[in-house]
UniProtKB/Swiss-Prot annotation:
It is an enzyme of class 2 (transferase). It is found in: Cytoplasm. The lineage of its organism: Bacteria, Pseudomonadati, Bacteroidota, Bacteroidia, Bacteroidales. Its EC number is 2.1.1.177. This is Ribosomal RNA large subunit methyltransferase H.
Length: 157
């Protein structure tokens, strides 16, 4: 299975980039994982928040394939423990999911079109974090899930 983290806007923090890249490197042992960045539409534009969400939504939908299993990372999504998340990923692998796409939206969330197109939502926390931090936290959780599934001593209950 290939896992894609589709994100709106680039990360400008070198520390976040380095830490995220370290987990991506570690993940290469278990699963194909890539981060795909959609350019931030707000730079130099005078779009309203709704117009910005719609523009980002069109870019998100253009990158999704009909066969993808797509999950929005959304504060209103279902919360999982690390063990539950690893079971969620394992189930997707066992049913033969070829490409799983997790989407981090822009600062105003997801457009109605994206919300209608995708049924699965996961919340990493009810707290608010920067999109840069969520990339790191999510990548670490995928790595943690892979170590759980492979019975390796990274996660402790």
């Amino acid at each position: 299975m290939k896992i894609v983290l589709l994100v709106v806007g680039k990360t400008d923090s070198k520390l976040m980039v380095q830490a995220t890249e370290e987990y991506i490197r570690r993940l290469s042992h278990y699963v194909s994982f890539e981060v795909e960045v959609i350019p931030d539409v707000r730079l130099g534009s005078k779009l309203s928040s709704e117009q910005q969400k719609d523009a980002e939504g069109r870019e998100i939908l253009a990158r999704l394939r009909p066969s993808d299993s797509t999950v929005l990372l959304d504060e209103r999504g279902r919360e999982y423990s690390s063990m539950e998340f690893s079971a969620f990923l394992q189930k997707k692998m066992l049913i033969g999911t070829r490409r799983m796409v997790f989407v981090i939206g822009g600062p105003y969330g997801f457009s109605p079109a994206v919300q209608e197109a995708v049924t699965d939502r996961i919340s990493l926390s009810r707290m608010t974090f920067s999109h840069q931090m969520i990339r790191l936290f999510f990548t670490e959780q995928v790595y943690r899930a892979m170590t759980i599934l492979n019975h390796e001593p990274y996660h402790h209950e």
